[in-house]
Amino acid sequence: MTINDSAISEQGMCEEEQVARIAWFYYHDGLTQSEISDRLGLTRLKVSRLLEKGHQSGIIRVQINSRFEGCLEYETQLRRQFSLQHVRVIPGLADADVGGRLGIGAAHMLMSLLQPQQMLAIGFGEATMNTLQRLSGFISSQQIRLVTLSGGVGSYMTGIGQLNAACSVNIIPAPLRASSADIARTLKNENCVKDVLLAAQAADVAIVGIGAVSQQDDATIIRSGYISQGEQLMIGRKGAVGDILGYFFDAKGDVVTDIKIHNELIGLPLSSLKTIPVRVGVAGGENKAEAIAAAMKGGYINALVTDQDTAAAILRS
């Protein structure tokens, strides 16, 4: 019996990956076939058949003989070390579009998490927009409601622009960063802004990107013009390693104080983000490892989608 490695399932996995994950959960984590079927969204009969197919094809022997084995090991370690609810580590491929593959992985995670008519809160950035582009059909068919976590309408259009016109999208009608703290306070007190922020905090699931100070001018927040290179250098000197939604935090996950941009942002603060039940972070690149680890330490995300090399770097840090 051979493994079909070309067909992709509704869960976004080829058959070999399904077999590898089932084997890992069954033999390594001690889950029952019923528990595995719930976790992967498969029938119990399908789990049983794939387990048998794994034995007959040679994937399952004394150890899991699959290129996905390393990813599963990283997922287990990340889940335990950072108390994550959900983890997906994407296998590394030479010359592959990592951002696109992370978007696919994050989209499939969200499809497994979201129930019809639930609300998804979205942060800005390339990773989240990649994800949103791959969710358009699901969002429409399941009537998922969207709400932005920050101002800056233009930052969301590459993802929102791909959606069906009938989709429910609640956008904060304000810039991401105001020209002063006073103007930011005034805008946040406007009902049209306040109502969207309250809706965002009440979301069922959130997805955010994670920026790293070490990215320098490659960081989305710089490329989008929200901060200058000089500001980023000053922020780094204050101990910041990364940011989510423009809020910077240190290696322990604590928000860095006395940073000018924090008072000028129009968006959900990280303390409020933490009240959303499921918070998915999607980020890749070894230069982001410290920032991703800090985001998990701070509790800003409790689910992660990343690539194999980044996962290894996080666990080394």
From Swiss-Prot:
Pfam families in alphabetical order? Sugar-bind (PF04198)
Q: What is its main location?
A: cytoplasm
Q: How is its activity regulated?
A: Inactivated by phosphorylated autoinducer-2 (phospho-AI-2). Phospho-AI-2 acts by binding to LsrR, which is then unable to bind to the promoter regions, allowing the transcription of the target genes.
Query: Which Gene3D superfamilies does the protein's record reference?
Result: 3.40.50.1360, Winged helix-like DNA-binding domain superfamily/Winged helix DNA-binding domain
Q: Does the keyword GTP-binding apply?
A: no
Q: Has UniProt tagged this entry with the keyword Repressor?
A: yes
Going by the UniProt record, its keywords in alphabetical order are: Cytoplasm, DNA-binding, Repressor, Transcription, Transcription regulation
Q: Which GO terms describe its molecular function?
A: carbohydrate binding; DNA binding
Location in the cell: Cytoplasm
State the InterPro entries in the record.
Answer: NagB/RpiA_transferase-like (IPR037171), SorC_transcr_regulators (IPR051054), Sugar-bd_dom_put (IPR007324), WH-like_DNA-bd_sf (IPR036388)
Could you name the Gene Ontology cellular component terms for this entry?
cytoplasm
PANTHER family of this UniProt entry? TRANSCRIPTIONAL REGULATOR LSRR, TRANSCRIPTIONAL REGULATOR-RELATED
Alphabetical list of NCBIfam families matching this protein: PRK15418.1
- UniProt family annotation: Belongs to the SorC transcriptional regulatory family.
Described function: Transcriptional regulator that represses the expression of the lsr operon in the absence of the quorum-sensing signaling molecule autoinducer 2 (AI-2). It also represses the expression of the lsrRK operon. Acts by binding directly to the lsrA and lsrR promoter regions. In the presence of phosphorylated autoinducer-2 (phospho-AI-2), LsrR is inactivated, leading to the transcription of the genes.
Q: Could you identify this protein by its name?
A: Transcriptional regulator LsrR
Record organism: Escherichia coli O139:H28 (strain E24377A / ETEC)
Q: Which gene encodes it?
A: lsrR
